[in-house]
UniProtKB/Swiss-Prot annotation:
Principal location class: plastid
UniProt keyword annotation of RNA-binding present: yes
Source organism, top-level taxon: Eukaryota
GO MF entry, a single one: rRNA binding
SUPFAM superfamilies documented for this protein: Alpha-L RNA-binding motif
Subunit architecture: Part of the 30S ribosomal subunit. Contacts protein S5. The interaction surface between S4 and S5 is involved in control of translational fidelity.
GO cellular component: chloroplast; small ribosomal subunit
Descriptive protein name: Small ribosomal subunit protein uS4c
Residue ranges of domain S4 RNA-binding in the record: 89-149
HAMAP family noted in UniProt: Ribosomal_uS4_B
Chain segments annotated as transmembrane: none
Length: 201
């Protein structure tokens, strides 16, 4: 299944706020309508919607998310927690968390168009897994810095997660540590996502 490229508001109206996909929020009252329908939803539907929430927020294909679930299942620790950590440490998501891109699709474009350096080298793979002590910077070209400056100028400055440090005047971000999954900030039950895939096999 390919990455979703359809109307974004349609998705947040059904699944709730997905800050990685779009900065838009559902209209007031839509959460109440969703809650009123929740009593009619089957357990399968609930697990499916949690999976879709995760997939659309991080902008993943079905195959990509399944691969991440498999990797998390083989790692030490709770599978759901490891899954969130893997997704949060993707380069496109790190750029989004740093505020160098307004959405994860926007961050992916920066990476694909070779505007981003990691430790001084161009990285054009959005799924690149960042590590503690990685240094993420805008490319040296004026266009690269202008694109990120536009985001800085137009976005509200939200509190950074503790695992990241931003030096905006240098167009530089630092990865201090692996993210604590409690900080993810997405209303998601990752255990239901793991359950969804465990019941598919």
């Amino acid at each position: 299944m390919s990455r979703y490229r359809g109307p974004r508001f349609k998705k947040i109206r059904r699944l709730g706020a997905l800050p990685g996909l779009t900065s838009k929020r559902p209209r007031a009252g839509s959460d109440l309508r969703n809650q009123s329908r929740s009593g009619k939803r089957s357990q399968y539907r609930i697990r499916l919607e949690e999976k879709q929430k995760l997939r659309f927020h991080y902008g993943l294909t079905e195959r990509q998310l399944l691969n991440y679930v498999r990797i998390a299942g083989k790692a030490k620790g709770a599978t759901g927690r490891v899954l969130l950590q893997l997704l949060e440490m993707r380069l496109d998501n790190i750029l989004f968390r740093l505020g160098m891109a307004s959405t994860i699709p926007g961050a992916r474009q920066l990476v694909n168009h070779r505007h981003i350096l990691v430790n001084g080298r161009i990285v054009d793979i959005p799924s690149y897994r960042c590590k503690p002590r990685d240094i993420i910077t805008a490319g040296n070209e004026q266009k690269s810095r202008a694109l990120i400056q536009n985001v800085f100028d137009s976005s509200s400055h939200e509190e950074l997660p503790k695992h990241l440090t931003l030096h905006p005047f240098q167009f530089k971000g630092l990865v201090n540590q692996i993210i604590d999954s409690n900080w993810v900030g997405l209303k998601i039950n990752e255990l239901l996502v793991v359950e969804y895939y465990s019941r598919q096999t």
